[in-house]
A protein has these predicted regions:
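Active-site acidic-Proline motif in GNAT/NAT acetyltransferases
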Residues: 83-89
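Nudix hydrolase/Nudix homology domain
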Residues: 4-6, 75, 87, 114-116, ...
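Active-site segment of metal-dependent pyrophosphate-handling enzymes
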Residues: 48, 58, 68, 90, ...
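Acidic, metal-coordinating catalytic segment for phosphate/diphosphate chemistry
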Residues: 11-51, 55-57
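Short, surface-exposed beta-strand-loop junctions and turns on beta-sheet-rich folds
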Residues: 38, 69-71, 147
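N-terminal amphipathic/basic-hydrophobic helices that include classical n-h-c signal peptides
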Residues: 1-12
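A glycine-rich, hydrophobic loop/mini-helix early in the fold
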Residues: 49-81
């Protein structure tokens, strides 16, 4: 690959720190807006994200592998779909957009599971947790993900605490699904 062919791919291999996110209170009420960079620089501005846990009819859980170029938790296994709300977007709109972009799925019925605040040293997220049962084809985005696969509940239990999964996934999965696996 020549140098000029590499440039477009390299440009995609990082997050856009100028994206505009809503800043919210812990009930989801919009208070203002900030860039991705401002939200992820340790300011701990509370911003909303959507998650979709995809189960198949066997009770297995689809997980994505985060690309190594991601600014948060690179190379770890994570929730099937996760993404930020754009400023002016509803959680439902963001969920459908992210599922289409990340997994190529358009025909699914999400179930709202819960809402919580995730705190880390770098950021604070208001997480809208959803699940769905889905047995159709999944086409993970080659630009946004490093693939994905279905995991059994035993595989997830064995991986917890070993540095393979994102801390956010571990805490969320234990909170909402480990003792009640299929909530689609």
């Amino acid at each position: 690959m020549g140098f000029l062919q590499f440039i477009p791919n390299f440009a995609r291999m990082r997050d856009n720190n100028e994206e505009i996110f809503p800043i919210v209170d812990d009930s989801g009420k919009v208070l203002g807006k900030a860039t991705r960079g401002e939200c992820h620089n340790g300011s701990r501005l509370l911003h909303p994200v959507v998650h979709l846990h995809v189960f198949n009819s066997l009770g297995e859980v689809y997980m994505q592998r985060r690309p190594d170029w991601k600014d948060i938790q690179p190379g770890k296994w994570d929730t099937a779909v996760g993404g930020h709300l754009d400023y002016g977007e509803t959680p439902e709109e963001a969920l459908r957009r992210e599922v289409r972009e990340e997994l190529g799925i358009t025909d699914f019925t999400p179930k709202n599971i819960g809402l919580y605040v995730f705190d880390s040293k770098r950021e604070r997220e208001l997480v809208y947790v959803n699940s769905a049962i889905y047995d159709g084809e999944i086409h993970p985005s080659q630009e946004e993900l490093d693939g994905g696969r279905f995991w059994t509940m035993d595989e997830i239990r064995d991986a917890i605490g070993k540095g393979l999964l994102t801390p956010n996934f571990e805490s969320e999965f234990q909170r909402f699904f480990l003792n009640n696996p299929v909530q689609g």
